[in-house]
Amino acid sequence: MLEKQSVNQKEQYNFNKLQKRLRRNVGQAIADFNMIEEGDRVMVCLSGGKDSYTMLDILQSLQKSAPINFSLIAVNLDQKQPGFPEDILPAYLDKQGVEYKIVEENTYGIVKEIIPEGKTTCSLCSRLRRGILYRTATELGATKIALGHHRDDILQTLFLNMFYGGKLKGMPPKLMSDDGKHIVIRPLAYCREKDIERFAVAREYPIIPCNLCGSQPNLQRQVIKDMLRDWDKQYPGRIETMFSAMQNVVPSHLNDHKLFDFKSITHDSDIIDGGDLAFDREALPLNPVGWQPEDDEDTEKRPPVRLDVLEIK
């Protein structure tokens, strides 16, 4: 009995620490990018996945202690996927006491009709969803649209653009929407996916899978995701260092002449951003920048995180 109590206490301690870390990361991102302001009405896009559930949960928690007043409204787009459990999200949101709206649009049928079997559906599906969500934000009077992309999504996008698009371009934490009418924010920008996974398991969210995304195992994004996860296992701290690099860009030491005016450098110019060692090899830190091992994380002993996903028939 005492042993069981001890285990429960340790689990609660670890959960509290995890929740505090997520709150801290979300709060820091909101502050760094001025994501939420006094009087904002934030439309939280809720897909039924672990990321959007966690985003709504943490935003609700921060709302209670924030020095500013803002409101939240959860929005789910019912894309009419066969077997989609329409009762799950309303029941969950009613229980949480969250204002919400379910938008019904048959984007699933449109995508299936237009995209040939075996081809990637993400681009069209995303474009359709985006237009519907922008329209809904206008109807609801939302001043911000919150999406559930996290730190790992941002890094994956960076590598996708480098490997396939020839660009150093990631996923911005805050941006103006395509139609020029809405501000889109990503409050989970500083949050690790593995933290979100553990939090979702502890919270026992009713996870709803996507029949479109989940049926495409060879997507380029999945390949990048697997690569980064392998790096994280083999070289602890590498992911944190790469994300730190995205926050410490030095345009004068890249090769984009549109971003930095190399032509203006003359013998009279000052040393820019520390100059360059030119003939000497730069000394690099022994430990990864931006990484600190979590004292509650014993990755060798902890079993893999498994989310309970609802079965769609």
Swiss-Prot record:
It catalyses: cytidine(32) in tRNA + S-sulfanyl-L-cysteinyl-[cysteine desulfurase] + AH2 + ATP = 2-thiocytidine(32) in tRNA + L-cysteinyl-[cysteine desulfurase] + A + AMP + diphosphate + H(+). Keywords: 4Fe-4S, ATP-binding, Cytoplasm, Iron, Iron-sulfur, Magnesium, Metal-binding, Nucleotide-binding, RNA-binding, Transferase, tRNA processing, tRNA-binding. Residues 288-313 are annotated as: Disordered. Its cofactor is Mg(2+); [4Fe-4S] cluster. The keyword Nucleotidyltransferase does not apply. Its EC number is 2.8.1.-. It holds the Pfam family ATP_bind_3. One of its GO terms (cellular component) is cytosol. Residues 299-313 have a biased composition (Basic and acidic residues). GO terms for biological process: tRNA thio-modification. Belongs to the TtcA family. PANTHER family: AMINOTRAN_5 DOMAIN-CONTAINING PROTEIN, SULFURTRANSFERASE-RELATED. Homodimer. This is tRNA-cytidine(32) 2-sulfurtransferase. It comes from Yersinia pestis. The lineage of its organism: Bacteria, Pseudomonadati, Pseudomonadota, Gammaproteobacteria, Enterobacterales.
